[in-house]
């Protein structure tokens, strides 16, 4: 299931009774701040999980069109690690 920030804001608005515009601003601010923190360091949200940026080193590869060797450049990847509690909630129905 894909959910947009606008949908989250609408759900928040109906749950809390705030205006949709205010809720959109809150959601955008929260996501912006999470991304800003996660860019610099590991970010842990208690009972949800952790976001961390991992640097991938350059590595050899092959150009599939020409079959010639290439170097795949280094890059940063954002990684999410779910908390133990979140994993337990997800797998709760299997018991």
UniProtKB/Swiss-Prot annotation:
Pfam families: Bac_DNA_binding (PF00216). It comes from the Bacteria. One of its GO terms (cellular component) is cytosol. Keywords: DNA-binding. InterPro entries: Hist_DNA-bd (IPR000119), IHF-like_DNA-bd_dom_sf (IPR010992). Gene3D superfamilies: IHF-like DNA-binding proteins (4.10.520.10). The keyword DNA-binding applies. GO terms for molecular function: DNA binding; structural constituent of chromatin. Transmembrane segments: none annotated. SMART domains: BHL (SM00411). Belongs to the bacterial histone-like protein family. This is Histone-like DNA-binding protein. The lineage of its organism: Bacteria, Pseudomonadati, Pseudomonadota, Alphaproteobacteria, Rickettsiales.
């Amino acid at each position: 299931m894909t959910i947009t920030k606008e949908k989250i804001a609408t759900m928040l608005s109906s749950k809390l009774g705030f205006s949709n515009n205010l809720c959109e601003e809150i959601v955008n601010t929260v996501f912006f701040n999470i991304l800003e923190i996660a860019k610099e360091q590991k970010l842990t949200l208690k009972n949800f999980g952790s976001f961390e940026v991992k640097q991938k080193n350059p590595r050899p590869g092959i150009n599939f069109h020409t079959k010639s060797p290439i170097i795949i450049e280094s890059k940063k990847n954002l990684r999410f690690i779910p908390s133990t509690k979140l994993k337990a909630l997800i797998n709760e129905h299997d018991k």
